[in-house]
Regions:
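Sec-dependent N-terminal signal peptides
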Residues: 4-13
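C-terminal domain-boundary segment and adjacent tail
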Residues: 58-60, 159, 220-291
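Catalytic domains of cell-wall/extracellular-matrix polysaccharide-remodeling enzymes
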Residues: 74-76, 83, 100-241
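Active-site beta->alpha N-cap acidic-glycine motif
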Residues: 19-134, 234, 250
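Sec/Tat signal peptide C-region and signal peptidase I cleavage site
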Residues: 14-18
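Acidic carboxylate-rich catalytic motifs and surrounding loops in phosphoryl-/glycosyl-chemistry enzymes
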Residues: 68-70, 161-162, 246-247
Length: 291
């Protein structure tokens, strides 16, 4: 944290940075990551978690753009999306199946986007936003073909400049027994917020002190139902103003993408996850929830 504080002081010394701290909040994988509506208990939990996200946004007067996986809308969750839009927030297309364009051909991917478009058209706001799952834009063959389709169908690509990697922390929270999560969240929250802030400082470094606007990626998940308000307050305490995605795209910071050579997939389940490997943030093993 000391290194982060020193870097922050150096950035503050630059007049251009001190005067232009603006950020747009974007939320992927709506309606709600790894949620079920198959029992009254699951319905209640999903509703409470989603409502917490809405409340954090509305109580802090923060604009947001959400990206919907159309194939992940469980029975009874359409109302979540209506609630999000009716609260004044934007909704965009995040495909039907959450495919990784770095791993498939353009035609199948385009069909998946079109399928989502048909389902989401009653809810999507203007301008029509699209975000690539996994931030994967494809290779030299698939990328231009998909981009041409999106352009012809009046989509605006929503880039990311700060990736919270929250799915890694969310996976850790799912490993904690349900009744113990409230007590555990404060410990996890500290690490999570520190990580987001380190990602923010890296983004500001990439911007090279230019007066650009940042775009933060988080997910509609269990973790952020607890912590979104803290994320918002952290940015406000550091002097950031929250703006719309439309405003951010007028002069965005350098965007993050996943090269076509990288094929990492994060998978999701409901209350339990398992698997192997090492998490570079938490130092734990396990599968990762949707990115």
């Amino acid at each position: 944290m000391r290194k982060l504080s020193l870097l922050w002081l150096l950035l503050l010394a630059c007049n251009s940075f001190a005067q232009t701290r603006e950020i747009a909040l974007t939320i992927d994988d709506l309606p709600l990551v790894a949620s079920k509506m198959d029992t009254p208990g699951n319905q209640q939990r999903a509703t409470e978690r989603f409502n917490k996200i809405i409340e954090a946004l509305t109580q802090n007067h923060v604009p947001a753009t959400g990206f919907v996986i159309a194939g992940a809308i469980a029975k009874g969750q359409w109302v979540f999306l209506e609630q999000f839009r009716n609260a004044g927030f934007e909704l965009g297309n995040h495909t039907y199946s959450h495919y990784n364009l770095n791993q498939m051909n353009a035609d199948k991917y385009i069909a998946d986007v079109a399928r989502a478009d048909k389902i989401l058209s009653p809810l999507m706001t203007e301008p029509k936003y699209f975000r690539y799952p996994y931030l994967a834009e494809g290779n030299k063959v698939s990328k231009p073909k998909v981009l041409n389709y999106l352009t012809e169908n009046h989509y605006v690509i929503a880039p990311v400049t700060i990736d919270s990697k929250d799915f890694r922390f969310n996976e850790q929270l799912y490993k904690v027994p349900y009744r113990s999560r409230e007590a555990y969240i404060n410990k996890l929250k500290t690490r999570y917020l520190e990580y987001i802030w380190s990602q923010t400082l890296k983004a500001e470094q990439r911007a090279k002190d230019q007066p650009v606007k940042q775009i933060l990626l988080i997910h509609a998940n269990l973790l952020n139902s607890y912590v979104l308000g803290d994320i918002i307050q952290m940015y406000k305490q550091h002097g950031y103003t929250f703006i719309t995605l439309t405003e951010a795209l007028k002069n965005p910071a350098p965007a993050l993408t996943v090269p076509a050579s990288e094929n990492t997939i994060e998978k999701g389940t409901d209350e339990n996850t398992s698997g192997g490997g090492t998490d570079d943030v938490l130092g734990i093993g396990g599968q990762l929830l949707f990115h």
